[in-house]
């Protein structure tokens, strides 16, 4: 045995292992490296391979499934995550992962190949999709989930404040409603179970003004103008951001709690030409919270795994309720929104580059 991996060293718990795998997978995606925990994951994988070869397996299937070790191997072997030129150490890591993948496939057989289906099923049974159901009657055709009535239990405000740290993440608004951070699965300001006003920003757009100050804008009917916030100017509210929001702060998937913000200004006006109202909110992030840089690491790779599984479940629900044509329409709407967001992202990046070159020209353009 090498001194770095003594046989007596206990394996991490499955929770610690999941955290480690998430960290390494994040590094692979962002920097094409195993990141700051490279040595730790390498020694763990080497030990797992040695155990397989000696038939003294210390990793059970439940741990492998929980920590997403199969996904870690796939990510290391994914050509998209390969640095160029390829360092010798990374080549060795790939060979290690390939050997381990073969050993696990041989040992677990069908169980290994059906891991994703098992995870998909367990989403609804105690997982991220617990206590929510699909509904075709929602106001927003892309938010077709609601809370099942059986799960509503009042929790004290003290518990509530401890429960939601910035960076808390859900698959959709219904999941956030189920956990009590908001009072309904609709994009409007509500008080959750704990008496704190929360506003989900799912649609519309947002721009960074300076420091902790952001401007949120949306167009729509008067009922979309969050008029109740007029009386909340100067007070703190919880802000949730969803992946459909046109904002550099929007999560890549699902809905994320981003912390407490103070409403600095509220304004809405009717555009006579379009007969639409325009809402503008000036929001300032409260100091002393987990930094936005940290919050923006969420969703983690394991949460994105859940997100991809959820999308498959959702597509199947839409197909069952609305047929193939309904599913096609649903997918087209999502794709149109995605393209629209992509255009917005490119335009805002271009604007930002102009701002840097032209001494604040970007700010003038964005007003």
Task: Give the positions of each predicted feature.
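Epigenetic methyl-mark regulator signature
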Residues: 1-257, 262-367
